[in-house]
Amino acid sequence: MQLVLAGKYIGAGLASIGLVGAGIGIAIVFAALINGVSRNPALKGQLFTYSILGFALSEATGLFALMIAFLLLYAV
C-alpha cells in the first residue's frame, strides 16, 4: 500500500513539471509582446490580441498538466 501511495506522489510530482514549461512559455509570449510594441507602437492592439491568444494556449498546456497531476493523486 505504501508503494502505491509513493508512486502516486512521484507521478503527480513529475506531471506537475509541465507547469514549468507553461510558465516559461508565458514569459516568452509577453517578452515578445514588449519587444514588438517597442519596435512598432502602432501595432499595439493587434500584438496584444495575439499575445493573449498565445498566453491562453500556453496556460492551457499548464492546466492540462495540473489536471493530470490531480487525477493521479485523487482518481487513481
Curated annotation (Swiss-Prot):
PROSITE patterns: ATPASE_C
Keywords, sorted A to Z: ATP synthesis, CF(0), Formylation, Hydrogen ion transport, Ion transport, Lipid-binding, Membrane, Mitochondrion, Mitochondrion inner membrane, Transmembrane, Transmembrane helix, Transport
Pfam families hit by this protein: ATP-synt_C
Listed InterPro entries: ATP_synth_F0_csu (IPR000454), ATP_synth_F0_csu_DDCD_BS (IPR020537), ATP_synth_F0_csu_sf (IPR038662), ATPase_proteolipid_c-like_dom (IPR002379), F/V-ATP_Csub_sf (IPR035921)
Cited CDD domains: ATP-synt_Fo_c_ATP5G3
Membrane topology annotation: Multi-pass membrane protein
Site residues by UniProt (Reversibly protonated during proton transport): E59
Record GO biological process: proton motive force-driven ATP synthesis
Modified residue annotations for N-formylmethionine: M1
GO molecular function, one term: lipid binding
Subcellular localization(s) per the UniProt record: Mitochondrion inner membrane
Record carries keyword Mitochondrion: yes
Residue intervals passing through the bilayer: 14-34, 52-72
Cellular component terms (Gene Ontology): mitochondrial inner membrane; proton-transporting ATP synthase complex; proton-transporting two-sector ATPase complex, proton-transporting domain
Role of this protein: Mitochondrial membrane ATP synthase (F(1)F(0) ATP synthase or Complex V) produces ATP from ADP in the presence of a proton gradient across the membrane which is generated by electron transport complexes of the respiratory chain. F-type ATP synthases consist of two structural domains, F(1) - containing the extramembraneous catalytic core, and F(0) - containing the membrane proton channel, linked together by a central stalk and a peripheral stalk.
Assembly and interaction partners: F-type ATP synthases have 2 components, the catalytic core F(1) and the membrane-embedded component F(0), linked together by a central stalk and a peripheral stalk. The central stalk, also called rotor shaft, is often seen as part of F(1). The peripheral stalk is seen as part of F(0). F(0) contains the membrane channel next to the rotor. F-type ATP synthases form dimers but each monomer functions independently in ATP generation.
Protein family (similarity comment): Belongs to the ATPase C chain family.
Protein name, per record: ATP synthase subunit 9, mitochondrial
